[in-house]
């Protein structure tokens, strides 16, 4: 996958992560960063622990923040404070969703809390012991925030 390739380039000396800041696309609401199903945990396991990135420069929405407006505003301010996103790595979901932004006629522009569709819950069930354990909501960057990145790379 893409994180394996980035790690390989780092090991060869082709990439240096020491000055990189990362802002993750999304995180499940109600899941702690130490939970093995969180995106925070996933990134630590698959990239951050394998390269020379400073952990204080890695940012993921706080899935445990119950105050949705506060968390979304905090994340948008964080991104703005970093000068925006230089490179946005994206994957496409089973139905074309980007982050947890489901296909729609109108998109939310900024980071927001979204209720996951039944199809997305079913698709993500494979990562959990049961369907009931799949979170029903997530924080996700909005399409406007994603599109404001200077470059976008879609991994499929």
Positions of the model-derived regions?
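Channel- or pocket-lining gating/hinge segments that regulate access to a cavity or pore
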Residues: 149-156
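Glycine-rich N-terminal segment of FAD-binding domains in flavoprotein oxidoreductases
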Residues: 1-12
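Class I SAM-dependent methyltransferase SAM-binding "motif I" and its flanking Rossmann-like core
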Residues: 99-143
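A glycine-rich beta-strand to alpha-helix segment
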Residues: 1-2, 77-103
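Short, structured patches in soluble enzyme cores that scaffold and shape functional sites
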Residues: 26, 62, 91-92, 102, ...
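Ligand-binding beta-strand-loop-alpha-helix segment within the catalytic cores
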Residues: 15-87
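Generic hydrophobic alpha-helical segments
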Residues: 6, 71, 75-79, 142, ...
